[in-house]
């Protein structure tokens, strides 16, 4: 007998297995755990100051908010000096309001990045007794690794899980772990393929009784409902659960240290890692993973520095205390119709906020490496996923006022909402920039305008206008600069990124490509916001993992309208003034060239050619961890197998 049990009955509090599972589930005996639905209109913050909160957390947050306010106040004062000489019109007043909000947005990111840079360079920020340089701790409790999936290629999915399983086994502590494949697949042929590949995996690694599989008959509430179903049925057996994504890979060493961190800190409810993006092959995927590897730590260490014990949850590559999650993270259905009503889409932010309300500490450990994920292969795939995130984040407008939330939890949600509203705000800023001269404000259309933004905005404050531009660009680009400096101070990682020169070329090329794609992102994010506000639901589709091929008809359908709009905006700007057209050139060019830029960055051969030249290299490519090598081997072997889907 291999220890595997297929359930035939359940307690009366849980529906019969036949109603819960499709196909042929292979599951352990149930250990039910109550997970009540939370009330957003009632509740109070249980613990105001956490034991594990870093010292001086109040001053850290004062620095962030005070620094943001001070920098924004100076920038607004200088902008006023540019606009004030002839009085401020209605359009200029709108411009000033937008500028204030947008500068505050980038100033806060800058202040956080500076804190992150100092933390990275000082090799500080370690917490919860989790030290990757110490000997591997011995575990005392049992942990479940959960891998939710939805219409994914099962061979690819379980290749990653096998690599994780083998890595955990190499730590010598496999007996403390069980693995669950939690399928929400709706396509019957993929479901049957999952069962076959799962059975092959168990045979291959002798995982019977340790690796389990089930497919929900009703995938209500998407991923959040998938995990909640497991918690309610099996959570009572496991003090911790580690949530993976379909493309997640983690080392056994990192997993063991996360579990030990939970065991040694009984008041901690969640520990979030910083997943490094790997395995990119297209130009777009490679520039994204390079940026995440070089700038990502600066940003992540910064937010972890001021988040303290009120960190956020990103939905995967994180370990969670099961009973804390069950007690406080049962999500209610929001009132109203979609897209704002119904099930909570971006569930991770809300679950973290509710757990913190319940008195549990939430931490992020960006210094703990060995946590990986994959990025979308093309800008189109990123924007499809981003549209779903847009709806989920805007839906938080119904949650942010919930009773008893910690103010930092509310701030997380407001930042998430603001992330999507900045896109239409930048667009409005650009349109007002053309609207002011068209309205005859502060410009002589018949006059000779030299190339000077200050002459465009009133001739008397040229120095201040240029100063605003330089400062804005510096604040925008500072995280990249700080990331490069931190890389220079780490010789080992610098070599792995191709050396100082190639890393600098990579950063420059990434900045240029990102600038060209920024108008595309701005346009489509703005459209996404308006679609959500108009009541259009995003749906739920499986993600593209590998192939970055895009057909020209698909590109024309997706970006043809944006190309025409960019050409039209360029013509209008040139009609107003060649100087204005030149000043708006980066935005206009990005829109007008959206089709070739997206096509170029979607090519695998372009990305791999740059890799051979040492551009966009990351340490995980020069010296890949064993778990990534193994996952890649298994996925390559899976490609050679007959297709099951």
UniProtKB/Swiss-Prot annotation:
Pathway in which this enzyme or protein is active: Glycan metabolism; osmoregulated periplasmic glucan (OPG) biosynthesis
Record Pfam families: Glyco_trans_2_3
GO molecular function (one): hexosyltransferase activity
EC id: 2.4.1.-
Subcellular location(s) of the protein: Cell inner membrane
Spans annotated as Disordered: 1-22
Transmembrane segments: 64-84, 98-118, 423-443, 465-485, 504-524, 559-579, 580-600
Record-level GO cellular component terms: plasma membrane
Major location category of this protein: membrane
Entry membrane topology: Multi-pass membrane protein
Domain of life: Bacteria
Role summary: Involved in the biosynthesis of osmoregulated periplasmic glucans (OPGs).
Annotated family: Belongs to the glycosyltransferase 2 family. OpgH subfamily.
Name used for this protein in its record: Glucans biosynthesis glucosyltransferase H
Organism: Xanthomonas oryzae pv. oryzae (strain MAFF 311018)
């Amino acid at each position: 007998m291999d220890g595997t049990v297929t359930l035939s009955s359940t307690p009366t509090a849980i529906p019969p297995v036949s109603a819960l599972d499709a196909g042929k589930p292979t599951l352990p005996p149930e250990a039910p755990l109550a997970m009540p639905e939370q009330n957003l209109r009632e509740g109070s913050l249980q613990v105001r100051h956490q034991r594990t909160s870093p010292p001086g957390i109040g001053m850290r947050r004062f620095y962030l908010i005070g620094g943001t306010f001070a920098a924004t106040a100076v920038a607004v004062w200088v902008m006023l000096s540019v606009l004030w000489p002839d009085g401020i019109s209605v359009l200029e007043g709108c411009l000033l309001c937008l500028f204030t909000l947008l500068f505050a947005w980038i100033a806060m990111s800058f202040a956080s990045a500076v804190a992150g840079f100092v933390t990275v360079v000082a090799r500080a920020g370690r917490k919860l007794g989790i030290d990757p340089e110490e000997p591997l701790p011995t575990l005392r409790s049992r942990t479940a690794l959960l891998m939710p999936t939805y219409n994914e290629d099962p061979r690819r999915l379980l290749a990653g899980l096998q690599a994780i399983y083998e890595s955990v086994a190499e730590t010598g502590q496999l007996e403390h772990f069980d693995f669950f494949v939690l399928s929400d697949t709706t396509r019957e042929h993929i479901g049957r393929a999952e069962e076959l590949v799962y059975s092959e995996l168990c045979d291959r690694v002798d995982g019977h009784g340790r690796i389990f599989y089930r497919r929900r008959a009703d995938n209500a509430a998407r991923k959040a409902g998938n995990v909640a179903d497991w918690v309610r049925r099996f959570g009572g057996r496991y003090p911790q659960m580690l949530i993976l994504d379909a493309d997640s890979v983690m080392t056994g060493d990192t997993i063991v240290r996360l579990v030990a961190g939970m065991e040694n800190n009984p008041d901690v409810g969640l520990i979030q890692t910083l997943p490094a993006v790997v395995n990119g092959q297209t130009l777009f995927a490679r520039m994204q993973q390079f940026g995440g590897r070089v700038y990502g730590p600066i940003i992540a260490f910064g937010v972890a520095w001021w988040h303290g014990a009120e960190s956020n949850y990103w939905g995967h590559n994180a370990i969670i205390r099961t009973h804390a999650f069950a007690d406080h993270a049962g999500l209610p259905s929001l009132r109203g119709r979609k897209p704002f009503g119904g099930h909570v889409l971006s569930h991770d932010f809300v679950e973290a906020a509710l757990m913190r309300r319940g008195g549990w500490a939430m931490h992020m450990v960006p210094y703990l490496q060995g946590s990986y994920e994959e990025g979308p292969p093309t800008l189109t795939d990123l924007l499809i996923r981003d549209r779903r995130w847009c709806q989920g984040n805007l839906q938080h407008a119904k949650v942010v006022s919930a009773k008893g939330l910690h103010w930092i939890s509310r701030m997380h949600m407001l930042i998430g909402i603001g992330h999507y509203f900045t896109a239409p705000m930048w667009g409005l800023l650009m349109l007002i920039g053309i609207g002011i001269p068209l309205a005859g404000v502060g410009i002589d259309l018949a006059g000779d305008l030299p190339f000077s933004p200050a002459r465009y905005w009133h001739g008397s404050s040229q120095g201040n206008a240029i100063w605003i531009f330089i400062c804005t660009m510096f604040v925008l680009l500072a995280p990249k600069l700080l990331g490069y400096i931190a890389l220079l101070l780490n010789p080992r990682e610098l070599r792995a990124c191709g050396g100082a020169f190639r890393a600098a070329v990579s950063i420059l090329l990434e900045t240029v490509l990102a600038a060209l794609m920024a108008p595309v992102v701005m346009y489509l994010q703005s459209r996404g916001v308006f679609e959500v506000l108009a009541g259009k639901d995003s749906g739920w589709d499986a993600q593209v993992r590998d192939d970055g091929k895009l057909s020209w008809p698909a590109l024309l359908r997706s970006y043809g309208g944006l190309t025409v709009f960019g050409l039209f905006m360029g013509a209008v700007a040139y009609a107003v003034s060649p100087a204005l057209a030149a000043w708006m050139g980066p935005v206009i060019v990005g829109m007008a060239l959206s089709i070739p830029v997206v096509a170029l960055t979607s090519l695998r051969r372009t990305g791999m050619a740059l890799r051979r030249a040492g551009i966009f290299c990351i340490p995980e490519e020069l010296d890949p961890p064993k778990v990534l090598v193994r996952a890649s081997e298994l996925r390559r072997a899976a490609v050679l197998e007959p297709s099951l889907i």
